[in-house]
Regions:
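Glycine-rich phosphate/nucleotide-binding loop
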Residues: 39-42, 207-307
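N-terminal beta-loop-helix "entrance" segment that forms/cooperates
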Residues: 30-52, 206-208
Length: 330
């Protein structure tokens, strides 16, 4: 099968090469179609995404991307925003779990964030009323709420999760977040075997840094989902351990959500774990569950052993050496 690979900026090319090597070692049979995108490509070409990229994604329905930067200034929109809008990837999935061997405050985090990906304040509807007043529109619709809540409960049912928690601020945003919460409760009634509750966003942030193990699946509107995704990544060591999947009806785009780290680009210092875990998510959705499980197990075992790991988790290994160590475990 074919899939699009977008290395992106900075360390992207190095960690994308890790994916290619692991994919070959697992005998996935994936034919990678590589396209350039990001600030570096824009500096060379004046375009943020290489011609043919979007058509290739549409044709095959699968893509994996590294970190991409958006040039500062007018004329460029975020690549992630463009991809979400073009392919209507309405759900952003962020599994977060503790990795033995990565020093953190908690050793029992295992939760999943389901973020609505298409509306809310991120719809980008904002304007100046005059020179001193700016206004932004928080757009929430019942169809989008129902779709993301149903996705969260279906995910919980399929993956043996026991509880889904709605994240909101309906005590203040009574119409917009109120609509989200009402829709969540309506959908929850169709899944009686799954516990459904809700938590106000500010209280949730406090509880996450006190006792994160009390949560299982969190479903949230766009803005809150963005905030808690990074917060939860911090609970397990940072964005270097946080894979992501953007899911639409006919297209799925997987990514490492950390930065492009231009200060270490080209130096064989990058940690490829996030993009390898994103690749494991992709394999799982492709039905290659055994290969996905093998890859995740190899990563966890390598990190837990702690001998051949990258500098950000206390080791001295480079990107290539770490990748080869993971492959050896496969």
């Amino acid at each position: 099968m074919k899939a699009v690979l977008i290395p992106g900026d900075g360390i992207g090319r190095e960690i994308a090469e890790s994916v290619r090597e692991v994919s070959a070692a697992l005998n996935t049979g994936i034919e990678w179609q590589e396209f350039a995108a990001g600030a570096e490509y824009a500096a060379e070409s004046g375009e943020l995404i290489a011609p043919g990229t979007l058509d290739a994604i549409e044709a095959c329905g699968w893509a994996l991307k590294g970190p991409t930067a958006t040039p500062i200034g007018k004329g460029f929109r975020s690549i992630n925003v463009q991809l979400r809008q073009r392919f209507s990837t309405y759900a952003n999935l962020r599994p977060v779990h503790t990795l033995p061997g990565v020093p953190t405050r908690f050793d029992n985090v295992d939760l999943v964030i389901v973020r609505e990906n298409t509306e809310d304040l991120y719809k980008g509807i904002e304007y100046m009323l005059n020179d001193e007043i700016a206004n932004g529109v928080k757009l929430i619709t019942r169809p989008a709420c129902e779709k993301i809540c149903r996705f969260a409960f279906d995910y919980a049912r399929k993956n043996g999760r026991k509880k889904v928690t709605a994240v909101h601020k309906a005590n203040i945003m009574k119409l917009t977040d109120g609509l989200f919460l009402r829709t969540f409760r309506e959908v929850a009634a169709e899944y009686p075997e799954i516990t459904a509750d809700d938590c106000i966003i500010d209280a949730l942030c406090m509880k996450l840094v006190q006792k994160p193990e009390q949560f299982d699946v969190l479903v949230a509107p766009n803005l809150y989902g963005d905030i808690i995704s990074d917060l939860c990544a911090g609970l397990v060591g940072g964005l270097g351990f946080a894979p992501s999947a953007n899911i639409g009806d006919s297209t799925r785009i997987y990514e490492a959500v950390h930065g492009s780290a231009p200060d270490i680009a080209g130096q064989d210092k990058a940690n490829p774990i996030a993009i390898l875990m994103a690749f494991a998510l992709m394999l799982n959705d492709l039905g290659e569950t055994d290969k996905a499980a093998k890859l995740n197990a190899a990563i966890l075992a390598q990190v837990e052993e702690g001998k051949v790991v990258t500098a950000d988790i206390g080791g001295t290994a480079g990107t290539k050496e770490f990748t080869q160590a993971v492959i050896a475990r496969l």
